[in-house]
Amino acid sequence: MLNPIVRKFQYGQHTVTLETGMMARQATAAVMVSMDDTAVFVTVVGQKKAKPGQDFFPLTVNYQERTYAAGRIPGSFFRREGRPSEGETLIARLIDRPIRPLFPEGFVNEVQVIATVVSVNPQVNPDIVAMIGASAALSLSGIPFNGPNGAARVGYINDQYVLNPTQDELKESKLDLVVAGTEAAVLMVESEAELLSEDQMLGAVVFGHEQQQVVIQNINELVKEAGKPRWDWQPEPVNEALNARVAALAEARLSDAYRITDKQERYAQVDVIKSETIATLLAEDETLDENELGEILHAIEKNVVRSRVLAGEPRIDGREKDMIRGLDVRTGVLPRTHGSALFTRGETQALVTATLGTARDAQVLDELMGERTDTFLFHYNFPPYSVGETGMVGSPKRREIGHGRLAKRGVLAVMPDMDKFPYTVRVVSEITESNGSSSMASVCGASLALMDAGVPIKAAVAGIAMGLVKEGDNYVVLSDILGDEDHLGDMDFKVAGSRDGISALQMDIKIEGITKEIMQVALNQAKGARLHILGVMEQAINAPRGDISEFAPRIHTIKINPDKIKDVIGKGGSVIRALTEETGTTIEIEDDGTVKIAATDGEKAKHAIRRIEEITAEIEVGRVYNGKVTRIVDFGAFVAIGGGKEGLVHISQIADKRVEKVTDYLQMGQEVPVKVLEVDRQGRIRLSIKEATEQSQPAAALEAPAAEQGE
């Protein structure tokens, strides 16, 4: 009854299996894709009829990781998976971006793609597997889809590109780039890099696109074998007469409106023209559909702007194609934050702060691929007031998570190593105004705020958003695009990096025919823009401040013998707890004996270091210490001599005469000088008050820690 159709092929170092017809047979299409034990089950359901009045394409992509895939039970209170994590949200966006432009214009039926990770090999990331699965399922479904598309991850190790590197290989790689495309065109690039050149990045894109052709060929073969018949869907016929009538009423006026350089004023004028045009047409014929008129007006708007750009005329706000809007750069704008900056580019503005914390502020991420600790956090907030609107304020949306991750990628390559700068760093970008590329403004602001906070970043980084308009062989690359140009162009891409190279590259391409040469021109123009912005930023602050903020915790590092770690921690953590309370510091101990002491006050840190050195000091036989009586027994007394160490003064060693009763000579808590007679193999210490008193040398001052009193 179940007769699965399977295709197997070699993809780089992995074997990929596509299987359909076995599960979820009521879905429009379903595919199980596996790559060396990492398996993702992808389903597609498409509605045959569009909702009446639907004016946009309702595509939903859900990506969900199941912990059973890694043989684990969720650690949450309810012991089941909750809402999508940040990582799942980012992969859902990664699947969505290359498939969205492959649906035909005018197709507004609801489509839902659900990718479920059901098995995971910790060396094979499920994101590429899920992207291949979505492409295969849509191609099999019969839904109008101009695919299939492939997907590949590209690494760069020892000056060689590596296809789909394993997780271990990625740690050695200077690049982590995901590229997706069809047979003829690249559609999407998402990457982070350790400051590689434009040519190296472009080479990786081309390499990934060439290598993924095997995926596309195999999906096509599977479709021949198991594909469902294509839907008989036709786009609505174009009403030429109505288009001409709308153009006659509005085209010239819209062209004039787009010469207004102020965003709010321009929007107001465009709204007036649209509403007047629609009112005029509805007065002539009330059977017309207002939504359809709105769409025609939008298409006219798009053509007005595109044709002006292609004709070499100034852009919407009066700039030439490679001009960047006016920049205003300020640092140290908030008095109590550890680092802050206000970065303004035209009508886009970001208030960015940097906060320093200790290792215990790091985020522990319990991911499917295993647990990891993140010591660099980047959060991006996009409040509705930034575009002059009202709206919900609450937990971050998909877009904010995606933009925050892109900005983080832009900065990650220049962050110092933990051994040189042992702080957890959190950067928050508040977008206070937005008109184009707020994520790249966040990169610039983050670089400034980190320098202001005294974080020794390896270089300043800046980001820029670029656009491309293409008609036939004629194309124009635009630097620093506005929000309006973003929607009207054929490709938009964002590049972040330093003077030396690229740290992050994100591309979204909506058309075919974007060649390697065009991408080369675009990347080189972006480099010029990036260097210009870096020049302006350097006038405000050209190197990290020599010292961190007085309000930031200072971390002092000392080394102790790993065998002594247990002494510093104490029984059940008693010693370290008492130390942190006594000194007002935060103390972290690593397995190799590295001790990090964080304090906002230098004196407190010195006190903590002194106490730890006392605790870890070796007990010297023959030396006299100041001790404190902690326990009295019939045969003598136990005396703490600091460092959590306790020794026995035998009754015969209390005085130089016979002692009948210990309490005649000693009381609990009494401070007495003691001489170390012996430390045996088991670390037990024999002490003498008698010999210490006889000896005239001054006692070595070593106080017992508070935790040891009254034990």
Curated annotation (Swiss-Prot):
InterPro entries: ExoRNase_PH_dom1, ExoRNase_PH_dom2, ExoRNase_PH_dom2_sf, KH_dom, KH_dom_type_1, KH_dom_type_1_sf, NA-bd_OB-fold, PNPase. Its EC number is 2.7.7.8. Residues 622-690 form the S1 motif domain. Mg(2+) binds at residues 486, 492. Transmembrane segments: none annotated. GO terms for molecular function: 3'-5'-RNA exonuclease activity; magnesium ion binding; polyribonucleotide nucleotidyltransferase activity; RNA binding. Residues 690-711 are annotated as: Disordered. Keywords: Cytoplasm, Magnesium, Metal-binding, Nucleotidyltransferase, RNA-binding, Transferase. The keyword Metal-binding applies. It holds the Pfam family RNase_PH. It comes from the Bacteria. It catalyses: RNA(n+1) + phosphate = RNA(n) + a ribonucleoside 5'-diphosphate. Disulfide bonds: none annotated. One of its GO terms (biological process) is RNA processing. GO terms for cellular component: cytosol. It is an enzyme of class 2 (transferase). It is found in: Cytoplasm. HAMAP family: PNPase. Belongs to the polyribonucleotide nucleotidyltransferase family. Involved in mRNA degradation. Catalyzes the phosphorolysis of single-stranded polyribonucleotides processively in the 3'- to 5'-direction. Component of the RNA degradosome, which is a multiprotein complex involved in RNA processing and mRNA degradation. This is Polyribonucleotide nucleotidyltransferase. The gene is pnp.
